[in-house]
């Protein structure tokens, strides 16, 4: 369990979603919002990609350090930065190697019609799962060129035209 692993490795469990009780679904298997703070790059919850309502916060003193750990990570699904500095935000947007980027938002997931997906080890094959890429993934395109003249007589190597 990632929540137990994060806590045992020393991350500060700020919000624990393990004991959530949803009225009408008492026997369900749910995890509520979970937030870890003071996560370091040697922790399992940093190294592995966790899907679900689990957020890991890595606090760093220098912008370049943040860019390095993000861009050197094997996964690249989503990341966020909190700043009031527009120059840093633009630098982050331009240079971070991540598929979904948030500026002053906790989870950089827009509406479902946008392509979902990250870069590097976070991508689902060659396509995202939402938006135009998702439609193209589930669509098999075929191009058919056809001509049905009334009389076909002789041989012609000319491209047919509409006359």
Model-identified regions with their sequence ranges:
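Cytochrome P450 fold signature focused on the C-terminal beta-domain
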Residues: 13-23
């Amino acid at each position: 369990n990632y929540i137990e692993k994060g806590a045992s490795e020393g991350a500060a469990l700020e919000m624990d979603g393990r004991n959530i009780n949803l009225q009408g679904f008492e026997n369900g298997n749910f995890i509520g919002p979970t937030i870890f703070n003071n996560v370091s790059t040697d922790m399992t919850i940093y190294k592995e990609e966790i899907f679900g309502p689990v957020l890991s916060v890595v606090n760093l003193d220098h912008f370049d350090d943040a860019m390095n750990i993000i861009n050197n990570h094997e996964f690249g699904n989503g990341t966020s930065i909190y700043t009031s500095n527009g120059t840093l935000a633009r630098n982050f947007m331009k240079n971070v190697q991540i598929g979904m980027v948030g500026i002053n938002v906790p989870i950089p997931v827009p509406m479902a019609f946008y392509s979902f997906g990250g870069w590097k080890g976070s991508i689902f094959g060659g396509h995202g799962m939402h938006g135009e890429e998702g439609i193209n993934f589930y669509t098999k395109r075929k191009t058919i060129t056809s001509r049905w003249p009334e009389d076909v007589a002789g041989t012609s190597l000319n491209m047919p035209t509409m006359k």
